[in-house]
């Protein structure tokens, strides 16, 4: 049974970072959503910034950045006909493996086999990642996490959806809910309804569902499967303090 993603998020004040991959009800588009949340001032001091083919996280106010470790990274990259989305610098690891075609058909899994969970004890935040075929619409999701907080045991799980159904998607997040330490996501990605063909409406509903205090930024990509062309939407809670330099 498909879950109502908006209700699920509205009832959870801190699922952490989240990825949704799926297909529009008319079957013509693939949707990619990624958001970040934060409880600390350092985690909240971020915005999504567009780059060629994707986004990266940057400090909203560089003067207030305490520690870039784990919070500043490329979150979305486009590799020919593949969108890569992750919650950390494993985006670059996946891109390197896929660009080199090091393990044909399994470069995603092979790349993540070289990575482990984040070193933020006692939470040991999972690394969540996804890839989308921008012409066929198939996708994969992965989570790399500790064994319920046991730093001596890493678990790597990949979920493959080569034939997604129209109006359906899958959702994975770093955490189950708030806590101390924060419990990692468990089980398979949640099967959720994609209820609109309109990316703007999808983004607006997701943004409204995320906890007002803890949400930081949201990214939504709509991909036309017939052509592979895409449009990106970025919503930031905080305004970036941009540093301009004069031309040389």
Positions of predicted regions on the chain:
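Charged, amphipathic alpha-helical segments
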Residues: 1-5, 102-119, 196-208
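Short, extreme N-terminal leader segments that mark the start of a protein/domain
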Residues: 1-24
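Short beta-strand scaffold segments in enzyme catalytic cores
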Residues: 16-24, 30-33, 74-76, 127-133, ...
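Conserved loop->alpha-helix
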Residues: 35, 40-81, 91-92, 97
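Active-site-proximal beta-strand elements of phosphoester/diester hydrolases
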Residues: 84-87
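Short histidine
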Residues: 90-151
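A two-mode feature
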Residues: 124-127, 132, 138-243
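Conserved small/polar residues in nucleotide/adenosyl-binding loops
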Residues: 244-248
């Amino acid at each position: 049974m498909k879950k109502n993603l908006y209700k699920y998020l509205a009832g959870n004040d801190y699922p952490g970072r989240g990825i949704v991959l799926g297909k529009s009800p008319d079957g013509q588009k693939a949707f990619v959503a990624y958001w970040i949340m934060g409880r600390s001032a350092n985690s909240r001091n971020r915005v999504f910034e567009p780059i060629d083919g994707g986004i990266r996280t940057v400090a909203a106010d560089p003067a207030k950045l305490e520690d870039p470790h784990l919070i500043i990274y490329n979150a979305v990259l486009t590799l020919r006909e593949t969108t890569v989305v992750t919650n950390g610098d494993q985006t670059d690891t996946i891109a390197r493996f896929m660009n080199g075609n090091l393990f044909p058909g399994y470069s995603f899994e092979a790349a993540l086999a070289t990575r482990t969970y984040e070193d933020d004890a006692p939470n040991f935040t999972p690394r969540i990642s996804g890839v989308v075929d921008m012409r066929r619409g198939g996708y994969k999701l992965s989570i790399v996490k500790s064994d319920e907080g046991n730093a001596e045991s890493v678990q790597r799980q990949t979920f493959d959806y080569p034939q997604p159904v129209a109006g359906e998607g899958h959702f994975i997040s770093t955490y189950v809910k708030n806590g101390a330490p924060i419990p990692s996501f468990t089980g398979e990605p949640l099967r959720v309804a994609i209820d609109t063909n309109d990316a703007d409406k999808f983004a607006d509903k997701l943004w409204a569902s995320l906890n007002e205090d803890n949400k930081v930024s949201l990214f939504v990509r709509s991909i036309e499967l017939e052509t592979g062309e895409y449009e990106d939407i970025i919503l930031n809670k905080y305004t970036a303090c941009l540093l301009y330099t004069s031309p040389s």
